């Protein structure tokens, strides 16, 4: 059974971290690269936000009994098939997961331009929240 309270709690966490990120986001690329503190804060908050999104996805897949995912990307596929998230959001989540892997595992030296560009996509977190919340409301109405 889907634990809506837990999902909503995670979505509230998402909002909190998003506010934090927006409070430290640089206004320009130059500001981003010139302040190691800002740069690292943004990287870490992006990482936490993406982990939060993945947690919500895992809770939804488990709670809706959509089957065991073979990998994280499978979470997104299952949620799109169930119409929890849109196809566009599924693709955005795949990109987020890729960024998370770069930030965490440092597959390559973290590209300042990639991180700065990702900061311009913070609205994706709001869209994700909106899509999940909308699905939860539909479940309640059913």
Could you describe each region identified by the protein language model?
Residues 1-142:
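Solvent-exposed interaction patches of small proteins and small membrane subunits
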């Amino acid at each position: 059974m889907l634990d809506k309270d837990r999902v909503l709690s995670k979505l509230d966490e998402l909002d909190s971290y998003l506010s934090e990120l927006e409070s430290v986001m640089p206004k320009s690329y130059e500001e981003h690269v010139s302040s190691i503190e800002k740069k690292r804060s943004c990287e870490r908050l992006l990482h936490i936000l993406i982990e939060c999104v993945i947690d919500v996805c895992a809770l939804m897949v488990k709670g809706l009994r959509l089957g065991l995912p073979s990998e994280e990307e499978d979470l997104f596929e299952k949620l799109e098939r169930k119409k929890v998230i849109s196809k566009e959001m599924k693709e955005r989540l795949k990109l987020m997961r890729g960024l998370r892997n770069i930030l965490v595992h440092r597959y390559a030296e973290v590209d300042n331009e990639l991180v700065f560009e990702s900061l311009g996509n913070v609205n994706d977190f709001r869209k994700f929240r909106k899509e999940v919340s909308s699905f939860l409301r539909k479940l309640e109405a059913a």
